[in-house]
Design a protein with these regions (language model features):
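Extreme N-terminal starter segment of soluble prokaryotic enzymes
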Residues: 1-5
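C-terminal accessory helical subdomains adjacent to catalytic cores in phosphodiester-
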Residues: 14-36, 40, 50-180
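Start-of-domain marker
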Residues: 42-46
Length: 180
């Protein structure tokens, strides 16, 4: 059985990635959420982009990949320009860069504090789930694909679009504590 470790921003991202992994790779996969820590489906340690970056170091990578076949690092880009994240989402002319360039800048940032030796050792075992803006954007195609295909391409205010759709079915995601 293959094993996949996760470094994610929060419990909702872990749930989404676990679902996607199971959907595409089947039941012969074991997912181990290492960041944030989880107990009985609830988040028990701090989350957010800062915690993901804090785990992007040689020791945490070694620990994760010593006992797992792969490591997926999930991070949203909605806070990438904040101090500490330090990824510029604009070019030298002040225009927002395209999604591919933003993705590459974020991956470079995630790997910044790792030694070249470690990167060589684990080449091919580190995967990235960089969410352009918010993870909730990944869910829009599941709900809007048939009735409003333009919503599927949204990258801003995704939680609001998703909640609007879910509220029609009397569901919703809490905006202040989406990890509950």
């Amino acid at each position: 059985m293959a094993t996949i470790a996760l470094f994610c921003e929060g419990a909702s991202e872990i749930k989404i990635l676990t679902y996607i992994i199971a959907k595409y790779l089947g039941d012969d996969i074991s997912v181990n959420a290492l960041q944030p820590e989880m107990s009985f489906g609830r988040q028990t340690s701090p989350g957010g982009w800062y915690e993901v970056l804090r785990h992007c170091n040689n020791e945490d990578f070694n620990n994760a990949l010593a006992t797992n076949d792969y490591l997926i690092i999930q991070i949203d880009t909605d806070s990438c320009s904040q101090i500490g994240f330090d990824v510029n989402e604009y070019d030298e002319n002040g225009h927002r860069v395209n999604d591919e360039l933003l993705y590459n800048r974020v991956v470079t940032r995630l790997l910044r504090d790792l030694s070249p030796e470690l990167l060589d050792e684990y080449c091919g075992r580190i995967l990235f789930a960089v969410c352009i803006n918010e993870t909730e954007c990944w869910l829009l195609p599941f709900y809007y694909e048939k009735e409003n295909p333009d919503k599927c391409a949204a990258t801003n205010n995704c939680i609001h679009h998703l909640n609007r759709k879910l509220s029609r079915d009397r569901l919703g995601i809490p905006e202040k504590d989406k990890n509950s």
